[in-house]
Swiss-Prot record:
Principal EC category: oxidoreductase
Family membership noted in the UniProt record: Belongs to the chloride channel CLIC family.
Cysteines joined through disulfide linkages: 22-25
Phosphoserine found at: 49, 159
Annotated SUPFAM superfamilies: GST C-terminal domain-like, Thioredoxin-like
Annotated GO biological process: chloride transport; positive regulation of sprouting angiogenesis; signal transduction
pH effects: Optimally active at acidic pH.
Tissue-specific expression: Detected in placenta (at protein level). Widely expressed. High expression is found in placenta followed by lung and heart. Low expression in skeletal muscle, kidney and pancreas.
UniProt protein name: Chloride intracellular channel protein 3
TM segment ranges: 24-44
Subunit comment: Associated with the C-terminal of MAPK15.
Length: 236
């Protein structure tokens, strides 16, 4: 493994250097940091340097993983490849232990997109309620004790875990957290509607993520996220 070269190409920010708005890019960036494997991160400004990928991944969308000289361009396949190739005992497994962790919150981003990009003001409230219901389902999952928690505390009524599957980040978190952060950031700015404090499980989840370098370090600046959504959001 020491001789293998890993290079992750991600979207650059507006300044052309730091990490830009791209939840799939952040997802794989988090996975590699959690694996603890040496890799090179390359930010790509496709506006200023559109040909930078042409030699090994022509026409591909970011993110792209270069494993030695082999280019991989599908985010899900890259994630599966990293989990299979960089596994125990040399690297930690990031697979969740509970199947439900993989699907928790999987409808939140779709509901958010429908709400935030809605051109018809009269539909805003109905679409916002749909988003809140999706967030409430995620909140219920995050607050329900998991099997291993109940094994230690049979009387536990509400989970105290930090992430979807327990107290460590998994692939499920790498997928959901970048999108959930976008939801909170964009709704707060453009609709003055951050994820409600009453959704204690979701707020705890986001707060816990911000304490982890693998999430905090890979996050684009809020200005990057807002700039990406500004053209799609209709003023109210």
């Amino acid at each position: 493994m020491a001789e293998t070269k890993l290079q992750l190409f991600v979207k650059a920010s507006e300044d052309g250097e730091s990490v830009g708005h791209c939840p799939s890019c952040q997802r794989l960036f988090m996975v590699l940091l959690l694996k603890g494997v040496p890799f090179t991160l390359t930010t790509v400004d496709t506006r200023r340097s559109p040909d930078v990928l042409k030699d090994f991944a022509p026409g591909s969308q970011l993110p792209i993983l270069l494993y030695d000289s082999d280019a991989k361009t599908d985010t899900l396949q890259i994630e599966d490849f990293l989990e299979e190739t960089l596994g125990p005992p040399d690297f930690p497994s990031l697979a969740p232990r509970y199947r439900e962790s993989n699907t928790a919150g999987n409808d939140v981003f779709h509901k958010f997109s429908a709400f935030i990009k809605n051109p018809v003001p009269a539909q805003d409230e109905a679409l916002y309620q749909q988003l809140l219901r999706a967030l409430a389902r995620l909140d219920s999952y995050l607050r329900a004790p998991l099997e291993h928690e109940l094994a230690g505390e049979p009387q536990l009524r509400e989970s105290r875990r930090r992430f979807l599957d327990g107290d460590r980040l998994t692939l499920a978190d790498c997928s959901l957290l970048p999108k959930l952060h976008i939801v909170d950031t964009v709704c707060a700015h453009f609709r003055q509607a951050p994820i409600p404090a009453e959704l204690r499980g979701v707020r705890r989840y986001l707060d816990s993520a911000m304490q982890e370098k693998e999430f905090k370090y890979t996050c684009p600046h809020s200005a990057e996220i807002l700039a990406a959504y500004r053209p799609a959001v209709h003023p109210r």
